[in-house]
């Protein structure tokens, strides 16, 4: 029994890595082959590592651990918010603010400010202020909500952090390492497994791949807190036929490469 089937992984495009020229050699053990210049991730290993991650997260949630989901890229942002909310976790899906964990005391004061203005809004106080002052406070509220809304109920550091795109979220990774907070991450073929405590070899650009893996980790948290979820049986599937890149996955991968080029 597995938390996900190989057909599900294939259909979501989890097996498509980056261009072979952009790989991290440390990911060699998790690569099945190269096709048309693209590394193909070994999905048998993906399924195994996902099962292990699921058990780890489920058991940790059962012990009362609190999780922070991090994914600020376009393809991941909506999924991160949706899945974190579904399982009652925290999330950062816009910009990672420097010191978000390592300078938690300062971040917490900004969260307190967010709640203060929210209370002013809900109580009707903003409507009684001069128009210019009310407008300024509402702009401040929108800005704070955008960057801190996903952690405004977080009163202390998380027990573990789930990350989509290790390279993009390098600052979050380094803060977790500095504070000895366990990192659970999707690792594409350009990532470094040494920077994660628990990892799942997976495409981290395609929306469907992110949705599947992050959704399963959210399931694990939910199960740990609330009870059993169903696992899946393996079915017969045309694995070779599913190895071809489809247009949606290619578009997501190309968008990510263009974004990295602009940042560089």
Swiss-Prot record:
Entry annotated with the keyword Cell membrane: no
Gene: rpsB
The entry's keywords: Ribonucleoprotein, Ribosomal protein
One GO cellular component, as annotated: cytosolic small ribosomal subunit
Example GO molecular function: structural constituent of ribosome
A biological process from GO: translation
Family the entry assigns: Belongs to the universal ribosomal protein uS2 family.
Pfam family name, one: Ribosomal_S2
Species, as recorded: Synechococcus sp. (strain JA-2-3B'a(2-13)) (Cyanobacteria bacterium Yellowstone B-Prime)
InterPro entries cross-referenced by the UniProt entry: Ribosomal_uS2 (IPR001865), Ribosomal_uS2_bac/mit/plastid (IPR005706), Ribosomal_uS2_CS (IPR018130), Ribosomal_uS2_flav_dom_sf (IPR023591)
Name of the protein described by the UniProt record: Small ribosomal subunit protein uS2
Signal sequence interval, chain numbering: none
């Amino acid at each position: 029994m597995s938390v996900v089937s190989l057909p599900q992984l294939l259909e979501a495009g989890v097996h498509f890595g980056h261009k072979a020229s952009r790989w991290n050699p440390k990911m060699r053990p998790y690569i099945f082959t190269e096709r048309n210049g693209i590394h193909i991730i070994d999905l048998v290993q993906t399924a195994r590592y996902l099962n292990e991650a699921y058990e780890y997260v489920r058991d940790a949630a059962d012990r009362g651990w609190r999780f922070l989901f991090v994914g600020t890229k376009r393809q991941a942002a909506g999924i991160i918010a949706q899945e974190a909310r579904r399982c009652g976790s925290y999330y950062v899906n816009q910009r990672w603010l420097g010191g978000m964990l390592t300078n938690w005391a300062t971040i917490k004061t900004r969260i307190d400010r967010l709640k203060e203005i929210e209370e002013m809004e809900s109580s009707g106080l903003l409507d009684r202020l001069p128009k210019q002052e009310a407008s300024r406070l509402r702009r401040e509220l929108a800005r704070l909500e955008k960057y801190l809304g996903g952690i405004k109920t977080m009163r202390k550091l998380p027990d573990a952090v789930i990350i989509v795109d290790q390279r993009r979220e390098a600052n979050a990774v380094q803060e977790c390492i500095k504070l000895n907070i366990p990192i659970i991450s999707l690792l594409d073929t350009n990532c470094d497994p040494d920077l994660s405590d628990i990892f799942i070899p997976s495409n981290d650009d395609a929306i469907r791949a992110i949705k599947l893996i992050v959704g399963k980790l959210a399931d694990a948290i939910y199960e740990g807190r609330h009870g059993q979820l169903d696992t899946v049986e393996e079915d017969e599937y045309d694995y070779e036929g599913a190895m071809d890149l489809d247009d949606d996955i290619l578009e997501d991968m190309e968008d990510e490469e263009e974004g990295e080029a602009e940042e560089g």
